[in-house]
Regions:
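Positively charged, small/polar-rich N-terminal and surface patches that mediate targeting and assembly
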Residues: 1-140
Length: 140
């Protein structure tokens, strides 16, 4: 199925100046937030191979990955807030923490405008997602 076959669009925006491992880490963490918030409707059934071994289910729809500068990530966060589109976020400070409560403390320590964003993910209706993501280019 294509992105347009779904009522919603799922997207990750990652900062372009990150190391490869950081980009992957950010994508993994922020998409977990989208999946948790979306609930069972966004997750498919278990995978089963030809030998009957079971594997965990995945999201049922494609995930679009975009690249952006730090300033553009701030713009994306602001647009999402204005349109009341829930987002998952990852900040640079979170690279130096080791657990969830420390991650939340890192985010709580900064005003929204001062967050050093390195990644954002969202799942929203196409129209809202397109408005929030306007002007971004797909990750190479």
């Amino acid at each position: 199925m294509a992105v347009t076959d779904f009522d919603t669009k799922v997207a990750v925006v990652v900062r372009g100046d990150l190391a490869g491992w950081q980009r992957l880490n950010v994508c993994a963490f922020v998409i977990s937030g989208v999946t948790a918030a979306a609930g069972p409707a966004a997750v498919g059934e278990d995978y089963v191979d030809g030998d009957g071994n079971r594997y965990l289910p995945l999201l049922v729809q494609p995930v679009l990955i975009f690249e952006a500068s730090a300033d553009k990530l701030t713009t994306v966060r602001e647009r999402a807030q204005r349109r009341e589109v829930p987002i998952a976020l990852y900040t640079a400070d979170m690279f130096s923490t080791g657990h969830d409560s420390a991650n939340r403390a890192a985010v709580r320590s900064a005003a929204a405008a001062d967050l050093d964003l390195v990644g954002i993910a969202l799942r929203a209706a196409h129209r809202d997602a397109d408005a929030v993501l306007r002007g971004l280019r797909r990750h190479p």
